[in-house]
């Protein structure tokens, strides 16, 4: 793989891609750093480029050196990783636009499907492991220590004086999970009250909460930073984000709503780029490694719900199952969600426009 040749392709890239490159960090067996933007040759036999969503950054920081050590033991090759972490939607657009990631971890299946549509990821990507998924979580609520606003469920987010944070679903895959959870909870409420799903009632429920939103940030991590800076009373986010911050000593109260959505996070080989770089074998090995007990334990350490059954069972007590838990299929699947919620004139557009 000729990194210098690849670095020349940076000229003319859109601004979002330049930001992705500026965010690149390198992790290798000896923590070597690479600088492909300057054309420097990396200190390794093989370079893998990982383009992931921002929430995965901390766990991958622990996982990649372990995979590099295993690859070295198995093949004798030293691997250097170049890593870019962005909001999931931004990362997917960057890869479609020319950011040559070999492997991608994204917040949702819909973002991987964008890469399939662009001819970058093979349509069979879900055949690997747990339908292509490497972690799970649920949408949860985080409040300040002691839960001063008495938040118990999504419905409390619509109360007067409650300031809410969640990121923008146009840039953040995590935010789409958040909006899906709120909208789905609205459908669940209507089903309980009327016996059928009522999209109008679900939209009204989403509108009532959105009216209390303090700001729409670019990514889940940006919303978390704003909350910890003192903005808002409650944040809608991934359960794993809250658990990871608590493990780092940050004071949060975690509330799992009665009706919330199961999050599933995929990973895939970006086959077109991996084949061009001659990294397909290593890229597939990394995906397989993400499913091993060793890697899944690390994901669990950072608050994710493992897809490995044995690791999940060992940590099951940490993962409450709410009574009304639903998955994306309750909303009709990703194609239906994209059409109903996030299309040009969809429900999210209507909520923003106040129509």
For each feature predicted by the language model, list its residue ranges:
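Alpha-to-beta junction loops
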Residues: 98-104, 161-163, 229-237
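Extracellular/periplasmic juxtamembrane helices and adjacent flexible linkers that interface
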Residues: 274-355
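A conserved helix-loop-strand patch within extracytoplasmic ligand-binding domains
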Residues: 116-189
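Solvent-exposed loop/turn segments at secondary-structure junctions
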Residues: 54-58, 88-91, 110-113, 141, ...
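Ligand-binding pocket segment of bilobal, Venus flytrap-like solute-binding proteins
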Residues: 190-257
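Early extracytoplasmic/lumenal segment of secretory-pathway proteins
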Residues: 29-118, 127-128, 238
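Short, low-complexity disordered leader/linker segments with a strong preference
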Residues: 1-45
């Amino acid at each position: 793989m000729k990194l210098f040749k690849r670095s020349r392709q940076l000229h003319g890239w859109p601004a979002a891609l330049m930001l992705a490159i500026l965010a690149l960090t390198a992790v290798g067996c000896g923590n070597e750093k690479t600088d492909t933007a300057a054309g420097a040759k990396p200190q390794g036999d093989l370079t893998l480029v990982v383009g992931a969503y921002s929430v995965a950054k901390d766990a991958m920081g622990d996982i990649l050196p372990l995979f590099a050590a295993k690859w070295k033991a198995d093949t004798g090759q030293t691997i250097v990783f170049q890593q870019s972490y962005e909001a999931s939607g931004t990362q997917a657009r960057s890869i479609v636009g020319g950011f040559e990631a070999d492997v991608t971890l994204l917040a949702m299946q819909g973002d991987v499907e964008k890469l399939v549509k662009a001819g970058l990821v093979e349509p069979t990507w879900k055949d690997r492991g747990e339908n292509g998924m490497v972690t799970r979580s649920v949408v949860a609520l985080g409040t300040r220590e002691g839960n001063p606003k008495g938040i118990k469920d999504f419905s409390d987010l619509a109360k007067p004086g409650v300031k809410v944070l969640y990121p923008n679903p146009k840039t953040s895959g995590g935010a789409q999970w958040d909006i899906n959870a709120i909208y789905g909870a609205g459908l669940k409420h209507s089903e309980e009250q009327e016996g059928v799903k009522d999209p109008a009632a679900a939209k009204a429920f989403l509108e009532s909460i959105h009216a209390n939103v303090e700001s729409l940030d670019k990514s889940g991590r940006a919303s978390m930073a704003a909350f910890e800076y003192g903005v808002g009373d409650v944040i809608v986010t991934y359960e794993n984000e809250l658990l990871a911050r608590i493990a780092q000593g940050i004071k949060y109260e975690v509330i799992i709503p009665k009706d919330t959505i199961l999050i599933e996070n995929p990973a895939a080989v970006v086959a077109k780029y991996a084949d061009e770089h001659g990294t397909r074998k290593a890229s597939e090995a990394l995906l397989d490694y993400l499913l091993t007990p060793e890697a899944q334990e690390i994901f669990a350490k950072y608050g994710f719900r493992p897809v490995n059954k044995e690791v999940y069972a060992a940590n099951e007590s940490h993962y409450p199952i709410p009574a009304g838990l639903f998955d994306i299929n309750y909303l009709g699947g990703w194609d239906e969600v994209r059409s109903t919620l996030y299309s040009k004139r969809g429900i999210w557009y209507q909520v923003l426009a106040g129509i």
